[in-house]
């Protein structure tokens, strides 16, 4: 029973995050700055947003994503 509840929670969480990310992408597509990381939800520092306009990931998540790409490349 616990496994079913865990799976339902996981699916619900995934659907929620997908919806949130779609909204963030629409906002970003209209030139409104994204202040929160799309992966973890932490704030993206202003200096990073100025240096990399349109950035959607914080430094930590960007580094993680780049490591994953190297690992699978």
UniProtKB/Swiss-Prot annotation:
Disulfide bonds: none annotated. It comes from Escherichia coli (strain K12). Keywords: Metal-binding, Plasmid, Zinc, Zinc-finger. One of its GO terms (molecular function) is zinc ion binding. NCBIfam families: C4_traR_proteo, PRK13715.1. The gene is traR. A zinc finger (dksA C4-type) spans 37-61. Pfam families: zf-dskA_traR (PF01258). This is Protein TraR. InterPro entries: Znf_C4-type_bac, Znf_C4_TraR, Znf_DskA_TraR, Znf_DskA_TraR_CS. It comes from the Bacteria.
């Amino acid at each position: 029973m616990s496994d079913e509840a865990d799976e339902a929670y996981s699916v619900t969480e995934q659907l929620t995050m997908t919806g949130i990310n779609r909204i963030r992408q629409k906002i970003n597509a209209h030139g409104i700055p994204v202040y929160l990381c799309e992966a973890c939800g932490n704030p993206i520092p202003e200096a990073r947003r100025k240096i990399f306009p349109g950035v959607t990931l914080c430094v930590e998540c960007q580094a993680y994503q780049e490591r994953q790409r190297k690992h699978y490349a």
